[in-house]
Amino acid sequence: MSGALHAWYSLRDLEALGGRQGELGGELELARLPRLASLLHSTAGSVRASLHFRQRGLGRLTATLDLTTTVELTCQRCLEPFAQPIAARVELLFVEPGEAGAETPQDYEPIELDDGRLLPARLIEDELIVAIPFVPKHARVEDCGSLARNLVT
């Protein structure tokens, strides 16, 4: 259910999910992710995402975020659109404000809650933004449009 990804959750809600190894998941329309949308050629499509919560030692709340989508970016060589598949799995550790660098296990990304709350859609949007190539371009020059082909010849 995508509505679950657009709702705010308190730390107490998240801890309850972690205690029973609960999950939040669904599809989010790319058009409803404004920071991501500004980087895309087109906002058509959606991202499939799930968050699996659990409690780790010493009562630490963790989650695994899995997401898959294909976004349409603008190639910086030929200025034409191309499809960029994105698939990511991120291990998250929820920390108190200011603890992001302290004692975070190497395999986990520390997440500070906004005023003790989490908006999953925002977290998913953050991970998608990080997954987009710094300089989006077709994998091969041969796949580029006429502008790049004219520059090469």
Q: Where on the chain are the PLM-derived regions?
A:
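Acidic and generally charged, gly/proline-rich low-complexity regions
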Residues: M1-T153
